[in-house]
C-alpha cells in the first residue's frame, strides 16, 4: 500500500433537526395543549486512533465527510431521531490541525484514542417548551443549530524510539533488517528506501523498542533536495538518533567527514529541536576495511569530526557489533524513562 503521510480533509457535522409547533388533537378535547417535540441532534464527527493503520491513503481519495442532520420533531410530543456520528479511523501518530488557523486540534498518540472533531448541531425546541401560565397555546418553536464545519490537515508522524539518519546507501535499511523483523528493500543504488520503515527490536523477552528508517538525506535536503527532507518530521518523536556512516563507500573520492557534517547541517537547518536530540555515531560496513585498519579509520573520523559522544563500529550485513548496539540503546532508553519518572 502506498505510504501517504499528509492530506487535507473537509468535515461537516450534521445540523440539528427543527422543533415543531403542534397541538394535541383528540376526540372530546377541542382545545388540546401544545405537544410539539424537539428536533434530533445532528451527527458529530470523531477521529479514532487505530494501530492497525499505517497510512492516510484512504483520505486522499475520500477527503470530504458530511454527517446527517437530525430529524425534525413531530406532534404528540415526539422527538426527532438524532443522526448517527461518523468515526474517522486514523493511524496512531496522526496530528490534526485546523488548516485555516494552524491550531492544533488533536495529536493521536495512543491506540483507540477518540477525539471530537466537529460537533453536531443541537435540535430545535418544540412549542411544548414555550407553554406558560400566560400563553397556553404557544406557536413558537426553534430551528436546529448548524453543525460545525472545518478544513483539517492530517499529518502522520511515525511513533518510534530510535531514528536512523544517514546518506543514501549508508546501510540503514540493512541495519533495521539485522536487528528487527522489518524487511525493507535493500539494494546497491541510492534512495532504495522511499518511505519510512518501522521495526520492533526485541532485546529480550520483556524489553523492546521501535526503530525508524527514513529515506537517505543529501546535501540541500532542508531546501527540498532528494527525498529525506519530507520524512525528517517522522524523527520528531524519537528519543535517540543514530547517525549511520558508511566507512567504506564504493566511490573512493567521497569525503566521509564532509558528508557526515553536511548531514548534520541539514538536520540543524530543518529543525533545531531535532538537531539537539541525543545522537550517536554508527560506523557501518567496517567489515569492508582491512582488519588492521578498522580501528585507525574510526579514530581518524572521530578526531576529524571532533566527536565526544558515544559511537559504535558495526557491520549490519554480518551482524558484527549489532548486539552491543541494541543493548546500549535499550539501556539508554531505560535510563531516560527512569529519569522522567523521577521528575
From Swiss-Prot:
Transmembrane segments: none annotated. GTP binds at residues 166-173, 191-195, 213-216, 284-287, 315-317. GO terms for cellular component: cytoplasm. InterPro entries: G_OBG, GTP-bd, GTP-bd_Obg/CgtA, GTP1-OBG_CS, GTP1_OBG_dom, GTP1_OBG_dom_sf, OBG_GTPase, P-loop_NTPase. Its main location: cytoplasm. Keywords: Cytoplasm, GTP-binding, Hydrolase, Magnesium, Metal-binding, Nucleotide-binding. Its EC number is 3.6.5.-. One of its GO terms (biological process) is ribosome biogenesis. It holds the Pfam family MMR_HSR1. It is found in: Cytoplasm. SUPFAM superfamilies: Obg GTP-binding protein N-terminal domain (SSF82051), P-loop containing nucleoside triphosphate hydrolases (SSF52540). Residues 1-159 form the Obg domain. GO terms for molecular function: GTP binding; GTPase activity; magnesium ion binding. It is an enzyme of class 3 (hydrolase). Monomer. An essential GTPase which binds GTP, GDP and possibly (p)ppGpp with moderate affinity, with high nucleotide exchange rates and a fairly low GTP hydrolysis rate. Plays a role in control of the cell cycle, stress response, ribosome biogenesis and in those bacteria that undergo differentiation, in morphogenesis control. Belongs to the TRAFAC class OBG-HflX-like GTPase superfamily. OBG GTPase family. This is GTPase Obg.
Amino acid at each position: 500500500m502506498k505510504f501517504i503521510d499528509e492530506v487535507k480533509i473537509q468535515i461537516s457535522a450534521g445540523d440539528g433537526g427543527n422543533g415543531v409547533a403542534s397541538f394535541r388533537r383528540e376526540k372530546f378535547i377541542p382545545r388540546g395543549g401544545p405537544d410539539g417535540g424537539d428536533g434530533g441532534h445532528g451527527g458529530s464527527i470523531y477521529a479514532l486512533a487505530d494501530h492497525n493503520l499505517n497510512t492516510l491513503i484512504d483520505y486522499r481519495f475520500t477527503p470530504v465527510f458530511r454527517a446527517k442532520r437530525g430529524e425534525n420533531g413531530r406532534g404528540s410530543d415526539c422527538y426527532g431521531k438524532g443522526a448517527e456520528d461518523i468515526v474517522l479511523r486514523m493511524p496512531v501518530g496522526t496530528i490534526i490541525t485546523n488548516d485555516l488557523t494552524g491550531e492544533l486540534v488533536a495529536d493521536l498518540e495512543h491506540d483507540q484514542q477518540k477525539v471530537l472533531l466537529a460537533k453536531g448541531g443541537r435540535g430545535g425546541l418544540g412549542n411544548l417548551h414555550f407553554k406558560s401560565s400566560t400563553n397556553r397555546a404557544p406557536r413558537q418553536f426553534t430551528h436546529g443549530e448548524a453543525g460545525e464545519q472545518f478544513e483539517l490537515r492530517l499529518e502522520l508522524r511515525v511513533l518510534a524510539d530510535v531514528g536512523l539518519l544517514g546518506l543514501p546507501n549508508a546501510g540503514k535499511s540493512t541495519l533495521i533488517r539485522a536487528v528487527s523483523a522489518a524487511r525493507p528493500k535493500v539494494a546497491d543504488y541510492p534512495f532504495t528506501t522511499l518511505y519510512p520503515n518501522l521495526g520492533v527490536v526485541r532485546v529480550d523477552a520483556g524489553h523492546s523498542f521501535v526503530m525508524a528508517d527514513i529515506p537517505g538525506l543529501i546535501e540541500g535536503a532542508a531546501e527540498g533536495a532528494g527525498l529525506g527532507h519530507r520524512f525528517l518530521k517522522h524523527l520528531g518523536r524519537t528519543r535517540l538518533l543514530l547517525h549511520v556512516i558508511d566507512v567504506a563507500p564504493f566511490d573512493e573520492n567521497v569525503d566521509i567527514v564532509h558528508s557526515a557534517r553536511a548531514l548534520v547541517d541539514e538536520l540543524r537547518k530543518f529543525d533545531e529541536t531535532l538537531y539537539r536530540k541525543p545522537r550517536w555515531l554508527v560506523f557501518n560496513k567496517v567489515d569492508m576495511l582491512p582488519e588492521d585498519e578498522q580501528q585507525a579509520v574510526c579514530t581518524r573520523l572521530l578526531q576529524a569530526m571532533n566527536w565526544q559522544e558515544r559511537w559504535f563500529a558495526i557491520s549490519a550485513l554480518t551482524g558484527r557489533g549489532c548486539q552491543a548496539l541494541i543493548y546500549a540503546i535499550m539501556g539508554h532508553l531505560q535510563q531516560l524513562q527512569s529519569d522522567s519518572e523521577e521528575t
